[in-house]
Amino acid sequence: MRIKLKEGIIMAMALSLCMPLHAAAAQRGYTESFQEENKDTEAICIIDMTEKVYNSLTRMPSVVDGKTQVMAFSVENLKSNSYVDGYDYGKSLNPGTRQTYYVVCTARSSGTTADVGLAYYNSQGKYIINSKTSLSGYDSYGTVSATPTFKNYGYVKNTGSAKLTASYVYMK
């Protein structure tokens, strides 16, 4: 009984030490300040797609097959009237060949809309939306064609009132 109590105390102490470290690491890794004031500072970039996005993709049989790959660009908690793009995370989409990009939008509530597409910065540093489509509703998705001439970045703007999750998928 005494051994179990001691083990429990040690385990509790270990957990209490780990939790602040994990929280600090998460804060360092996921909070970034952007230069542009209309960018969402609370958007989280996730390397792997979330379970929610995966569930959305499973309802798209033409996309989920052996040739489908998930881009390392997903955002969660994108606030209303704010946008993010892959440039912030160093994730450019430069296919080199013609490919179709699928964009999955998971709304936090019904009626959420989003503009998604591809963008690039020209030689003068001007931000140009290269190709765009609009998504609406829960678990909706659309396609965006890439232009291999430019170094494109995934672009997501929340045009609705609720937070949303968006993820890029491309098909070879």
Please report, for each region that a protein language model flagged, where it lies by residue:
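Surface-exposed loop/edge segments in extracytoplasmic proteins
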Residues: 71-73, 123-132
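Short, surface-exposed beta-strand/strand-loop-strand elements in extracellular ectodomains
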Residues: 111-127
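Noncatalytic modules at the cell exterior or secretory-pathway interfaces
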Residues: 100-104, 145-160
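Beta-sandwich interaction modules
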Residues: 91-93, 132-148
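Beta-rich globular "head" domains
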Residues: 93-111
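Intrinsic-disorder/low-complexity, polar/charged segments enriched in Ser/Thr/Lys/Arg/Asp/Glu/Gln
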Residues: 70, 86-90, 98-102, 139-141, ...
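N-terminal prepro-regions of secreted/extracellular proteins
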Residues: 1-92
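Edge beta-strands of jelly-roll/beta-sandwich modules across compartments, strongly enriched
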Residues: 112-116, 155-172
